[in-house]
Curated annotation (Swiss-Prot):
Annotated catalysed reactions: 2-(N(omega)-L-arginino)succinate = fumarate + L-arginine
Native source species: Serratia proteamaculans (strain 568)
GO biological process: arginine biosynthetic process via ornithine; L-arginine biosynthetic process
Protein name according to UniProt: Argininosuccinate lyase
Cytoplasm as UniProt keyword: yes
Keywords in alphabetical order: Amino-acid biosynthesis, Arginine biosynthesis, Cytoplasm, Lyase
Keyword hit for Ion transport: no
Pathway(s) annotated for this protein in UniProt: Amino-acid biosynthesis; L-arginine biosynthesis; L-arginine from L-ornithine and carbamoyl phosphate: step 3/3
Location(s) in or outside the cell: Cytoplasm
Coarse class of the protein's main subcellular location: cytoplasm
Organismal lineage: Bacteria, Pseudomonadati, Pseudomonadota, Gammaproteobacteria, Enterobacterales
Amino acid sequence: MALWGGRFSQAADQRFKQLNDSLRFDYRLAEQDIVGSVAWSKALVTVNVLTAAEQQQLEQALNGLLAEVQADPQAIVSSDAEDIHSWVEQKLIDQVGDLGKKLHTGRSRNDQVATDLKLWCKQQIGELHQAIVQLQQALVETAEANQDAVMPGYTHLQRAQPVTFAHWCLAYVEMLARDESRLQDTLKRLDVSPLGSGALAGTAYPIDREQLAGWLGFASATRNSLDSVSDRDHVLELLSNASISMVHLSRFAEDLIFFNSGEAAFVDLSDRVTSGSSLMPQKKNPDALELIRGKCGRVQGALTGMMMTLKGLPLAYNKDMQEDKEGLFDALDTWMDCLQMAALVLDGIQVKRPRCKEAAEQGYANSTELADYLVAKGVPFREAHHIVGEAVVEAIRQGKALEALPLTDLQKFSAVIGDDVYPILALQSCLDKRSAKGGVSPQQVASAIAAAKQRLA
């Protein structure tokens, strides 16, 4: 049964109904719609629309409906109801008769759906928070197990300076911390209840909206009814949060795809997160990581689509806003899946320390150490930079590492170079010197791991 039939003398065309109906996706708001209806029934008692006995009867029926929904959410979709609000109301009327028709007094689907969606978003933020923390914990655990795994760090995908696999893991812990912080910021702004705003001008019943907001677990009620029913900033913010985090996850995936490649061979991935080829028997493809990387664009598309949907809408509610849900649901589902998959990838990863160290010793990653050595000997840095560049060219010509060049060859570029240069060029020395906060020295990495464990406990 439609909630708006009295004005019309003809039934809706089936093609329009198919376009218009939203139950196939907004059934996911069933629990929130029922919870909101229970709170609204209590509010109607305070303005003498319902008696206490009527409210108790409605609440009992709604709680029974909630249990039914929780047992089998998908069963809702088989109904021909227009949307989740229509479905809940009709089910209620089926159970309690005409009393069910009183529940919508003073309420519009406009403030109802805005409330439902905010309640759903709050729940999702809690679940996403847990998934982010679990991935951070997996990264910290992997870092702790690989503090001694020296590997090359890259700029421009060229070997730059030595780092450790632990330090690499901790970089993503920091990115995820910002992702989680953005979620909490979004929660603060969306934690205001639109219920009681009516269609656009507010409800005609003197309901205490602050009390109503409290019953629903909101921090407060919205201040303007027009804004209340047309606001979808929280949808944009969550899609933005998801998009930024998916960029981080995509970079994580790309790094590991490269590290797992035959060209780098720094890590082995578990069979649980890889697949084979239908033609080439030797293949072990990093499909889980490639899917994370690929799904990043899908989430970005949801954000762009919602921006374009909202940009030209006049106040207050417009049916265009029904487009807020499918993209949001899909994007947050995708984000959750990718967070969980990234943690699963780490669960079985094996770091190949000898190969990592071998690669770190190649590519003249200790060149900066030689420049710093010259600076310590009184050579201006820019001059030292040039000297080391020339020394690298000579080392390449000879096919040797910098530390393998004889002292006499090094002294051709600067007379201040002495025997004490060789310990400076050692791989471990390169790490040990980076002892400022956030650096790659063993002490700093160990300290960062301890701090992260404390934050995530």
